Amino acid sequence: MRRSSYLVLGLSVFLSLKTAMAQEVASRMVEDGGTGKYTAVMTTQGSLPTHTVFTPKDISKFGKKEKLPVIAWGNGACFNSPWEHVNFLSEVASHGFLVIAIGVMPKESGEQVKDRSTSTQLTDAIDWAIAQNRDKNSAYYQKIDVNKIAVSGMSCGGLQTLEVSSDPRVSTVVVCNSGIFKTPGNGRSNMPNLTKENLKKIHTPTLYLLGGEKDIAYANGMDDYQQINHVPVFVANMDVGHGGTYSQPHGGEFAKVATAWYKWQLKGDKQAGKLFTGQPAGLAANSNWTYEKKNMP
């Protein structure tokens, strides 16, 4: 009887270890893992092979006292891989966020994946995070703050973000180098075909990060800002064009501003929020940026 019990216990431990090991299929550090206090890694998860997960490397630090808010990310050109944004996404994750980007992990070399993705992959990311938080066999069990979720994206990924922004689980929206076309159908065939009416479905504080007048999405994004009057909205412009600063070390200025927004909206960090609050807002001290805001302190 005792031997049988030992065998059952041993099998249980083996299966638990096997499950934990199977969750992370591949892992790679981007740059130095970010400047935040949690060194980040880029991973492929066995239970979500359709996405790339940027996460603090050591998640044992998260649980009862501090949990991981969720950021679902849509890529530029609606690519099915976040290869254009890895520096930016790794940097954000290093500040204690679970960033789930649409698409497969970028290759270390060679031609990157340029297949197209769909907006539903953002909600797939949210579904996965919630499921992982309640799965006792998951490394993320009870470590995720499922009540603090952002949807975000760049260019075509920004349109994907706006398409799913009505999801009641969403806590904040971040739209980068994007905006809804004034004339429906003016985008490429693979882009979400939205109208300005979609903006009325936003129900959370919203941040737009644009690349100034040289950004091909500038007019659309600024028009979105003008038409959003029912929620807090902040639009910031840096004169860098449509490409932003995502590929710069640690994601450059766009990562700094976006991370501050995420910290404020998803972690309740009032110090980070000072970048956006006040008259003038703290961002006014940074000569790289101009901004407008409404329905905000």
Predicted ranges, named:
Residues 8-18:
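Bacterial N-terminal signal peptides
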Residues 23-66:
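N-terminal cap/lid segment of alpha/beta-hydrolase-fold proteins
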